[in-house]
Amino acid sequence: MANTTSAKKATRKIARRTIVNKSRRTQMRGAVRIVEEAIASGDRDAALKAMIRAEPELMQAAQRNIVHKNTASRKVSRLSHQIAKLAK
């Protein structure tokens, strides 16, 4: 347990940030899940619309250090590639 007042304050701040980060991570995962479901159903138009919403979510999560920027880029790339395969 924290002994100094600054350590106690840091613990409180971490708890608040954890709640915010979990919320943002859940929102990001939900956006990705919608894209994946549209791809699985074979609906290219729905997948494109969902991807337009998911890509900014991923990039903002990377910008806020919720996920690593390479992880976000990799997810965007893989989803885009799967959507492109639907057109063929």
Curated annotation (Swiss-Prot):
GO terms for cellular component: cytosol; small ribosomal subunit. GO terms for molecular function: small ribosomal subunit rRNA binding; structural constituent of ribosome. Pfam families: Ribosomal_S20p (PF01649). InterPro entries: Ribosomal_bS20, Ribosomal_bS20_sf. The keyword Protein transport does not apply. Keywords: Ribonucleoprotein, Ribosomal protein, RNA-binding, rRNA-binding. It comes from the Bacteria. One of its GO terms (biological process) is translation. Belongs to the bacterial ribosomal protein bS20 family. Binds directly to 16S ribosomal RNA. HAMAP family: Ribosomal_bS20 (MF_00500). NCBIfam families: S20. This is Small ribosomal subunit protein bS20. It comes from Rhodopseudomonas palustris (strain BisB18). The gene is rpsT.
